[in-house]
Every structure is written in structure tokens, then in C-alpha cells.
């Protein structure tokens, strides 16, 4: 069978997202608003298949056809009759659930491919003898012929998402390299175009000269439009000797369905902010305009404390190998008032707490823009994965001048808290009970600080298009050098475009460090209801959780390519390195032998040294992170961050050897089953499913009752239209990296 790195185990944890009580408390109008927003999110989430791998849309279409014709129990009878064992059929269900959960065949957390853990010929027998194949023999056989090989292939380039020889990505055509990505970013910057809703396709003429297409996501294609904001950009350009063409219409039929549902949601908006927000999102997805999405986000920021909260669009850039294109996501959630009250108290203290951060006031925003901070129970989260907390929007210009919102996703955190003692790796026995007791509360504190005062803090020094600066060049001093500011962001440059491949992880590291640093502040712990010995335990478990996570992070490092595949985990490893470097026995990692006779390890944190050794080390590191970010010093930022993120086998830690131990004892990330909403007359019903791979599959089989077959056709048509860009996805066209 396949290497365990590339399969999902049969005993993978599966949890259901509990939002029954939150949904019950909604009024009929709020339910209708949530229903249509959920439909929009689920439709848009299908675009992620096209953003992940060339074969993902076909795999999704094949699975959807199979399970629409026979539910998991019915298909099981057929599979056993075809000679599969119970374990092999369960492996197939887990694979299918994984594809639905990640919206593709690469893990959303780690960007590693996963393949079915059963023989290919056995799966082929099940598929070609299924009810779906009886009903539509040509279509099912065609889908299998298109994706069967790629579904199982683990040749080196296909094991991970990446650019050029490093991996596979559908944000770029298969012949693009990192140099192409940099050139395209410079082109986009020169035209003041955002990369968030784009993909890049490169073609090479007979003389080897490249030609680039930048394609915007939109309902409209080449049709004339009244909107000059985007249409004036839709043309041919010459940039540094290379032809560029800006086009639009990517994912058009999918976005058409998103727009139709957003139009319906408008009728149930609670206020004018929501109505205007939806109108701008509709404009954005119709025209391909990120500027319209920014305007919608402005109204969204102004919509303080809504009962039903949502956000939708091309948002997070973690999975673009270059770090600037957004993956589609949409969520709909309901406010949890009790937990939100704690976060509101944290917001009320935020201005005071910002002063505790280890950089001068001139490196903080000129005015603190009081954000919304709510705890939400998720009803729908469409995309490749569900985070525990979010700080959005990601647009730097809005964050600096208009503000942002923070959300903590309470029912997602509840799934994350559930820890079984026997699965707690790398901890001392006497730490395990304390860890289980305080992991949940400490995580609430860390998520709150990470989102509000981590992502929400710090200023970017900018020179605008008129040459004006947002800082005083004469008086502002760099605390690291003692000199005046030497570098800054010029008009059109953003954090993501400037720091590109390290931007996401560097920013997560800054936010995580702020959480660790500020959780030492007594006022913070009082806000969350902890004092005395309990407060000390919360601090200890928060720091212990971080250093353990730094060790677990090694699973997400690829030694062959010298790269990290997950931004948050790279950030946690960097923090572990900083705390190890602090010395004095603050953190130690000891290789051991487990009770099973196999390699193991133990992480120890000396709680008596957190304040005396850990805090000063974190203070120095955090100040450097912020100064380099504020000043847009890419060279300095890369040197610092990549230095700490380097993984070697040098003693005393021998991280590459430890990585083997981590892989040996890794636990797969849980799959989460989400409910559906269904409209019956004018009533919206909540449909829940069991916490199992079969339950997760059923939830997807019932997600698109009206137009499932149509969506499968749309996905395969869109994938086929661009298939030539990855033909032989395992290798780039000759002459191209």
C-alpha cells in the first residue's frame, strides 16, 4: 500500500459541527438570509477544485455520480460482492470523504497529495460495476479514464502542491516557474491589479517566446460592459519584453450560481450595510473586480455585531505557491453571545494592550480602529478547510484605514479541543492531564490575542502615488539600527506582493508570538476569567502547546525540496527555534524510545523560566519581525525568517532525525461533517449527519439536490477547457521548468 504520508487512515477522526442551538435561535428571516448565503458559499467552494489540481474536478464529479446513484451502505454491498474487504471499502469511503473535506485530492493543511489506500484495480471494478456506471456508462468510464491514473500517482512532482518542478498547482499553467510568477506579480503591480482573483497561463510560441494570460474570475467574459474599472484593463500589454493579455471569465458558470444566491439573500438583509455589501460582492463576482470586493468589505466592516455573520470571496493566499492568489471561501455563522462578551472585553482593553507590545508607538497604526470581535458557531464553511479563527479582510489598505473584524469559530474550536490522552504525543505523563484540562481555555486566549492584537497590530510605512508618506521621515527611528527609516512600501505594493512566498507564514508567526507574549499579561487572563494558579496553568499550557506544535510541525517540512508546506506550522517551528535558542533549559527536546520499542521524543518546558528567559527572547524576536514588516525590508525579513525556518540534522536537536519520529507518530487531522440547510416552502430546515466518513459523504450527496448533475458537467467542462495547460501534469513541456 501507499506510504502512510500519502493516505488518510481508516480510523481518521471525524467530527460533526454542532450548530443546532445557534440555528434554533434564528428568526425566520435570519434563517432565509443564512440559507441563501450558505448556498452561495457552497457553490463558490466548488471553484477550489479548479484551484487545486488538474484532476480534482473529475474526481469530485466521479464520486458525486457514484454516491448519488448508491449511498455508502448500498455501494458497500456492491463493493464486497466485487471482492473488496471491509477495510478496503472503508479506505475508499475515507478517501472520498477526504476529497469532499479538502475540496480536492491534496490536504488543505500541508498541501500533500492523498491517494486511495486500496489497489487501483479493485477500485476500478467497484466504479465500473456501480449503479452510476450502469446508468451512464460512457460518462463514468470517461471520468475514470481521465482521473484514475492521477488519482493514484505518487510520482515526485505530484506529491505536493508547488510551482515548476517543486509540485503541481492550477493557479499557474504547468510550465510556469517562480521567475514567471515574479514577472507576473511585477506586471500586476504596474497595472494596479490585484492577484487575489487571478490565475496565470503561459504559452510558448514556436521560437520559444513566452506569452502570458492573466485571467480574472468573473461571470462576464469578453462581453462589453458598462464597468470601466475592469474593462479598461482587459487588453494586451507588453511588459519587460513579454506580451501579457488580461482576460476574465474564470469559473464563470460557478460564479453565476453564487451571484444568483447573493441576489436572493439581499431580500433578507438585516440592514443597509448588508444590502450594500452584497451588491458589491455581486458586482465583484460579475465583473471580476477586486475593487468592488474591497467596497463590499468596507460595508462588511461597518456591519457591527450582526446575528448572522458571513464573508465570501477569493480570500486566503496560503495555497498559491507564490503567495498572492486567493482561494475561494465562504462562511455563514451565528453569533455566540456569551463567548462574544469576553472578546468584547478584550477589544475594550486592546488600546492599552497594544502599548505593551515591544515596538515603539510610531510602528503602530496612527489610530486604533475598534474592530468587531465575535465568537461564532459555523453553519457553513465552504472551501478547502475550516480555520479556528479569522482576521479579515486581508486588504492592507482597508486594514490600515478602515479596520477589520475578528472572529473565533467556537464550534470549530470545540472539535479541536477534544483530545484523547493516548493520542497526546511527545508530552511528559504529568503534563498530559494538565494539557487536557487547560488546552481549550488556553486556546481561546491564544486565538483571541492572535487575531485581535496579532494580525490587528502594527503599521506599514507607505509612500502613496502622490509621494506622500504616512510616517515622519525625520523623527521615526528604526529601534534595531538607531537610524532613520531607509525602506517602505511604494504605491501598489502590498505585504503579500512584496514578501510573497514567506508573507503568510511570517505573518502567522508574528500573530502567534503576540499571543504568547501578551498571555503573560494578568489583565488578559482576568478578561477570560482566570487568576492565580489557574492563570499560571493557562499560560503554561499555552506555551507548552506552542513548543509541542513546533515539533509536530516537522511533518509539514519536505527535506527533498527544502520547503515548508503549511504556513502556521512553519511559524510554530520558528517560535520553537527562538525559544530553544534562548537556552538556560527553557525548552528541551529529548529523543527517547517508546513503550512500543520505536523511536519517540519528549518536549519539556521549564515553567519557572517562561517570564525570565522566554519573554525577553520573544520580545527581541517580535520587535525584529515587526520592524522588518513595517519597513518592507524583504531582504532582512527573509534572512531572519528563513534562518530560523531552516531544518537540519545538526546537534543538539537533530531535527531531520526528529522528523522521522514525528512522521512515525503523526495523527491525521480530523475531518469535519457540516450540516445542510433546506428550504421547505418558506421554512428553512437544518439537516444534520452522523460523524463518520459515510455521514460526510451523505452531506455532500444532499448538498446540491436541484443541480448536482449540472454542476458536475460544469466542473468537468471547465477543467477540460484548460486541460492542455497541464497535459502530462507530471512533467512540464520540454524546455520549460
UniProtKB/Swiss-Prot annotation:
InterPro entries: Dipeptidyl-peptase3 (IPR005317), Peptidase_M49 (IPR039461). It catalyses: Release of an N-terminal dipeptide from a peptide comprising four or more residues, with broad specificity. Also acts on dipeptidyl 2-naphthylamides. It is found in: Cytoplasm, Cytosol. Signal peptide: none annotated. Zn(2+) binds at residues 450, 455, 508. GO terms for cellular component: cytoplasm; cytosol; extracellular exosome. GO terms for molecular function: aminopeptidase activity; dipeptidyl-peptidase activity; metalloexopeptidase activity; zinc ion binding. One of its GO terms (biological process) is proteolysis. Binds 1 zinc ion per subunit. The modification N-acetylalanine is found at residue 2. Activated by Co(2+). Inhibited by EDTA and o-phenanthroline (in vitro). Keywords: Acetylation, Aminopeptidase, Cytoplasm, Hydrolase, Metal-binding, Metalloprotease, Protease, Zinc. Its cofactor is Zn(2+). Detected in placenta (at protein level). Detected in erythrocytes (at protein level). It holds the Pfam family Peptidase_M49. The active site is at 451. Its EC number is 3.4.14.4. It comes from the Eukaryota. Belongs to the peptidase M49 family. Cleaves and degrades bioactive peptides, including angiotensin, Leu-enkephalin and Met-enkephalin. Also cleaves Arg-Arg-beta-naphthylamide (in vitro). This is Dipeptidyl peptidase 3. The gene is DPP3.
Amino acid at each position: 500500500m501507499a506510504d502512510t504520508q500519502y493516505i488518510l487512515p481508516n480510523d481518521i477522526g471525524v467530527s460533526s459541527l454542532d450548530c443546532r442551538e445557534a440555528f434554533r435561535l434564528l428568526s425566520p428571516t435570519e434563517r432565509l438570509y443564512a440559507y441563501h448565503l450558505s448556498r452561495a458559499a457552497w457553490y463558490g467552494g466548488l471553484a477550489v477544485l479548479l484551484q487545486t489540481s488538474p484532476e480534482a474536478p473529475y474526481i469530485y464529479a466521479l464520486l458525486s455520480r457514484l454516491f448519488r446513484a448508491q449511498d455508502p451502505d448500498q455501494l458497500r454491498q456492491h463493493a464486497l460482492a466485487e471482492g473488496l474487504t471491509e477495510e478496503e471499502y472503508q479506505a475508499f469511503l475515507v478517501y472520498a470523504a477526504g476529497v469532499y473535506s479538502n475540496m480536492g485530492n491534496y490536504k488543505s493543511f500541508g498541501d500533500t497529495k492523498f491517494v486511495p489506500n486500496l489497489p487501483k484495480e479493485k477500485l476500478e471494478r467497484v466504479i465500473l460495476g456501480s449503479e452510476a456506471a450502469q446508468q451512464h456508462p460512457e460518462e463514468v468510464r470517461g471520468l475514470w479514464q481521465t482521473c484514475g491514473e492521477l488519482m493514484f500517482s505518487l510520482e515526485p512532482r505530484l506529491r505536493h502542491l508547488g510551482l515548476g518542478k517543486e509540485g503541481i498547482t492550477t493557479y499557474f499553467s504547468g510550465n510556469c516557474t517562480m521567475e514567471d510568477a515574479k514577472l507576473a506579480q511585477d506586471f500586476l503591480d504596474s497595472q494596479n491589479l490585484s492577484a487575489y482573483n487571478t490565475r496565470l497561463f503561459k504559452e510558448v510560441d514556436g521560437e520559444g517566446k513566452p506569452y502570458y494570460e492573466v485571467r480574472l474570475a468573473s461571470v462576464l467574459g469578453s462581453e462589453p460592459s458598462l464597468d470601466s474599472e475592469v474593462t479598461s484593463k482587459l487588453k494586451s500589454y507588453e511588459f519587460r519584453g513579454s506580451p501579457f493579455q488580461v482576460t476574465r471569465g474564470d469559473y464563470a458558470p460557478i460564479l453565476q450560481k453564487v451571484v444568483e444566491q447573493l441576489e436572493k439573500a439581499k431580500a433578507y438583509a438585516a440592514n443597509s450595510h448588508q444590502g450594500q455589501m452584497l451588491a458589491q460582492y455581486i458586482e465583484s463576482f460579475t465583473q471580476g473586480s477586486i475593487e468592488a470586493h474591497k467596497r463590499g468589505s468596507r460595508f462588511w466592516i461597518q456591519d457591527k455585531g450582526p446575528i448572522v455573520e458571513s464573508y465570501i470571496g477569493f480570500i486566503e493566499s496560503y495555497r498559491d505557491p507564490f503567495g498572492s492568489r486567493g482561494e475561494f471561501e465562504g462562511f455563514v455563522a451565528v453569533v455566540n453571545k456569551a463567548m462574544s462578551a469576553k472578546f468584547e472585553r478584550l477589544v475594550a482593553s486592546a488600546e492599552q494592550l497594544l502599548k505593551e507590545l515591544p515596538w515603539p508607538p510610531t510602528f503602530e497604526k496612527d489610530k486604533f480602529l475598534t474592530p468587531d470581535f465575535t465568537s461564532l458557531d459555523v453553519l457553513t464553511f465552504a472551501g478547502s478547510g475550516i480555520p479556528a479563527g479569522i482576521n479579515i479582510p486581508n486588504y492592507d489598505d482597508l486594514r490600515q484605514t478602515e479596520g477589520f473584524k475578528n472572529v473565533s469559530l467556537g464550534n470549530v474550536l470545540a472539535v479541536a479541543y477534544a483530545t484523547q490522552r493516548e493520542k497526546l504525543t511527545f508530552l511528559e505523563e504529568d503534563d498530559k492531564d494538565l494539557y487536557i484540562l487547560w488546552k481549550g481555555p488556553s486556546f481561546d486566549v491564544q486565538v483571541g490575542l492572535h487575531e485581535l492584537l496579532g494580525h490587528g497590530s502594527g503599521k506599514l510605512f507607505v509612500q502613496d502615488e502622490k509621494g506622500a508618506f504616512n510616517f515622519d521621515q525625520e523623527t521615526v527611528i528604526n529601534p534595531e539600527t538607531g537610524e532613520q527609516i531607509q525602506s517602505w512600501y511604494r504605491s501598489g505594493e502590498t505585504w503579500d506582493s512584496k514578501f510573497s512566498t514567506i508573507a503568510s507564514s511570517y505573518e502567522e508567526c508574528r500573530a502567534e508570538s503576540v499571543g504568547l507574549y501578551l498571555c503573560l499579561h494578568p489583565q488578559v487572563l482576568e478578561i477570560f476569567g482566570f487568576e492565580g494558579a489557574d492563570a499560571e496553568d493557562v499560560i503554561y499550557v499555552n506555551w507548552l502547546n506552542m513548543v509541542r506544535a513546533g515539533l509536530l510541525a516537522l511533518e509539514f517540512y519536505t527535506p527533498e525540496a527544502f520547503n515548508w508546506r503549511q504556513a502556521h506550522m512553519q511559524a510554530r517551528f520558528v517560535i520553537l527555534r527562538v525559544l530553544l535558542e534562548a537556552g538556560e533549559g527553557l525548552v528541551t527536546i529529548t529523543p527517547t524510545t517508546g513503550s512500543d520499542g520505536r523511536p519517540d521524543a519528549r518536549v519539556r518546558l521549564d515553567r519557572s523560566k517562561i517570564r525570565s528567559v522566554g519573554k525577553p527572547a520573544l520580545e527581541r524576536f517580535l520587535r525584529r519581525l515587526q520592524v522588518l514588516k513595517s519597513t518592507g525590508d524583504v531582504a532582512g525579513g527573509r534572512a531572519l525568517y528563513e534562518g530560523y525556518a531552516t531544518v537540519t540534522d545538526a546537534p543538539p536537536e537533530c531535527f531531520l532525525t526528529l522528523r522521522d519520529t514525528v512522521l512515525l507518530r503523526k495523527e491525521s487531522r480530523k475531518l469535519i461533517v457540516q450540516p445542510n440547510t433546506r428550504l421547505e416552502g418558506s421554512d428553512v430546515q437544518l439537516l444534520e449527519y452522523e460523524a463518520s466518513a459515510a455521514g460526510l459523504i451523505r452531506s455532500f450527496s444532499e448538498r446540491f439536490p436541484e443541480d448536482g448533475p449540472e454542476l458536475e458537467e460544469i466542473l468537468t467542462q471547465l477543467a477540460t477547457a484548460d486541460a492542455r495547460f497541464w497535459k502530462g501534469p507530471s512533467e512540464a513541456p520540454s524546455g520549460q521548468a
